[in-house]
From Swiss-Prot:
Keyword annotations from UniProtKB, A to Z: Amino-acid biosynthesis, Aromatic amino acid biosynthesis, Lyase
Family: Belongs to the type-II 3-dehydroquinase family.
Biological classification of the source: Bacteria, Pseudomonadati, Pseudomonadota, Gammaproteobacteria, Alteromonadales
Active-site positions on this chain: Y24 (proton acceptor), H99 (proton donor)
Pathway the protein acts in: Metabolic intermediate biosynthesis; chorismate biosynthesis; chorismate from D-erythrose 4-phosphate and phosphoenolpyruvate: step 3/7
Name the record gives this protein: 3-dehydroquinate dehydratase
One Gene Ontology term from the biological process aspect of the record: chorismate biosynthetic process
Gene name per UniProt: aroQ
Signal peptide feature range: none
Amino acid sequence: MSHKILLVNGPNLNLLGRREPSVYGHQTLADIVAELNQQAKLAEVELEHIQSNAEFELINAIHATDAQMIIINPAAFTHTSVALRDALLGVAIPFFEVHLSNVHAREAFRHHSYFSDKAIGVICGFGSQGYEFALAAAIKRLNQPQ
């Protein structure tokens, strides 16, 4: 496998499938990651995954990765984490921002993202399918001639 993508999932996403399924869907994070691993395998891309409720663990994973692309669902850190933004900018790895729900159709405090202005693209409101869209876009970019 010639390319590697880091999938980063932030706080409370470990509760997918039981936390507000009307907003976030019924799939668990393990289900979503398993589907993404299949998609990556078909494209001959390695997918590395981390989920943490601790900001520093996500930052450390970003600092340590040798991936060429990142897909991140910062979850609640979207609206609060300058440190996570700085980690992404510090490693200078292109990234896609993903949200299960349409954050712009929710509470006003969820409308602001510390990541969107630096992301290649933002995908929100498509549920778990948003991850699939992001992975397909990341793979396509990685396979483009330099």
